Every structure is written in C-alpha cells, then in structure tokens.
C-alpha cells in the first residue's frame, strides 16, 4: 500500500508540473465499413468519428477493422494526422488495415512495419485456427517536445480461433521484447476479443501494465457495446511499459452528433507519463 501511495503521489506531482510530458493514446475499432448496419452504417457515423477525434485529441491512435476508404476519410477530415499500415489481405490496400495514426504536430515517425499473426509473419497469411488474416503494425515514434522515443504496436486478435488468439498474442509479446534492445517505452493497443480474465493475457501481463488497471483516474465501463446502450464488454485494451505512470484511462461513451453510436466499440484512451 505504501508503494502504491508513493507511486500515486509521483504521478500527481508530474501532472501538476507545467512542463508535463506525456502521450495520449487511443484504441478505436471503427467497425468494418462495408457492413450492412442500417442506421449504424459508416456513412452515417463517420462525421461523429471525426468530431470525437477532434474532441479527445490523441497524439496517436490505433484503429481496427479499418478499410482504405475509412482511413482516407479520417485523414481528409482531421488536421495534422498521418498514418502507417497495410491491408491484411495483400500487404497493400486490400482488407482490414491495422493502421496507426500519429499527430505530426507532436510526434515524428522514425520507423514502422507490419507482420502477420501466423507461422509465416512476413507474408499475407492466416495463422492456426483463425477465421481471418490478422496483423500487427508497429511504429517507432519520437515525442517532439521531450525528444523521447517510444514504440507503439496495434493489433486485432481473431474473433473465432482460440489457438490463434493465444499464439497471435504470444507472437506480439515476443516481438515486443526482441524489437526493443534499447528498452524504450512501449505501448500496445488493440481489440483482443477476450475478457480480462482470459489466460491468454497472462504472458502480456507479465511484461506490460494494463492502463485500465494502473490509471490514477480510471473507468470501469466496457468497450464493446454491440449497438446496445446497456452493454459493455471489456475486450479492447491499452498496455504500456517504460512510462513513469498512467494518469487517465477513459472509455468514450459520449455522443457526437445525432447518431446513437460512433461504432459497435467505444473508443478507449489513456494519458501516459514519461
């Protein structure tokens, strides 16, 4: 308890400093843009998504289920964002892109890549018992005002294959360790399609910290609403390591515009302190 209080006071002290340095990161499952969702179709939700991004103002955010025309819309209607990522079907534009967006006003992209969650990670492929091809996109980013470097990884685990979820996340965990010999701070976001008590999260919990659990100001709401107001399953996550603390974790349940939902997943975001 004493250690927790000291840690809490340290984060609060950092936040009270006028030269506070940190990263606001978001995970947002946009919902597949070609789905027949009626009143919840992308064309009716896309403006609300832009309003949400303008309101929250993440330094970087990872999206899931994004198709190229959804990415293009976000780029065209927001300021100062660029993105990296490839389509999972061909390594170019086809299929879901595990895109990472970053603000050019606060961050500089130094390197990036995408790999497939499969036995052949360098090529478009489906792994184990997965229903779909799954990928992870990683970036090495520089925080301009502080000069600090950090890695950011974004992924989407399979919704059907239990083995694919376990092995896919295991691959991500191994890569997180091997890709970072300089021990830079690290962020992982994604739709993991598992609840917090799922055993497949145990290897990740050993090397990284859940922002939901660690935040000074946290949020108990679930993230997957399935177009229902009274529903909220926790299947979307933000993990971190190498940061001094997490000041905030929030599930974005506010309405933006006239649409009932901006997606079948509520966006989640965290404020991480260097």
Please provide the spans of the model-predicted regions.
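Structured beta-strand-rich core segments of catalytic domains in phosphoester-bond hydrolases
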Residues: 60-149, 245-252
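Bacterial Sec-dependent N-terminal signal peptides
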Residues: 1-22
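Catalytic metal-binding/acid-base residues of hydrolase active sites
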Residues: 31, 67, 156-158, 192-195, ...
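Metal-dependent phosphoester-hydrolase catalytic domains
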Residues: 140, 163, 167, 174-186, ...
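Short, Asp-centered acidic motifs that coordinate Mg2+ and/or phosphate
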Residues: 23, 59-60, 150, 185-187, ...
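Active-site-proximal beta-strand elements of phosphoester/diester hydrolases
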Residues: 22-34, 98, 110-115, 148-158
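N-terminal, active-site-proximal structural segment of metallo-dependent hydrolase catalytic domains
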Residues: 15-77, 90-95, 274
């Amino acid at each position: 308890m004493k250690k927790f209080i000291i840690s809490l006071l340290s984060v609060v002290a950092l936040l009270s400093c006028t030269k506070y340095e940190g990263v606001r990161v978001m995970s947002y499952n946009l919902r597949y843009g070609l789905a027949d969702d009626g009143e919840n179709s992308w064309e009716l939700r896309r403006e609300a998504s832009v309003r949400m991004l303008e309101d929250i103002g993440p330094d970087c955010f990872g999206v899931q289920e994004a198709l190229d025309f959804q990415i293009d819309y976000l780029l065209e209607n927001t300021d100062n964002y660029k993105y990296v990522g490839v389509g999972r079907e061909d390594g170019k534009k086809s299929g879901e892109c595990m895109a990472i967006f970053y603000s050019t006003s606060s961050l500089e992209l130094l390197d990036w890549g995408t790999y497939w969650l499969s036995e052949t990670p360098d090529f478009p492929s489906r792994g184990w018992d997965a229903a779909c091809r799954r990928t992870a996109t990683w970036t090495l980013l520089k925080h301009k005002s502080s000069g600090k470097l950090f890695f950011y990884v974004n992924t989407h685990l399979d919704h059907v294959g239990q083995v694919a979820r376990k092995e896919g996340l295991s691959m991500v965990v191994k890569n997180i360790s091997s890709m970072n010999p300089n021990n830079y701070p690290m962020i992982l976001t994604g739709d993991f399609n598992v609840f917090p008590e799922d055993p497949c999260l145990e290897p990740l919990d050993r090397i990284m910290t859940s922002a939901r659990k660690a935040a000074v100001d946290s949020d108990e709401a679930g993230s997957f609403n399935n177009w229902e107001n009274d529903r909220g399953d926790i299947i979307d996550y933000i993990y971190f390591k190498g940061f001094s603390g997490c000041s905030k974790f929030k599930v974005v349940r506010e309405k933006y515009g006239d649409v009932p939902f901006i997606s079948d997943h509520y966006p989640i975001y965290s404020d991480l302190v260097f």
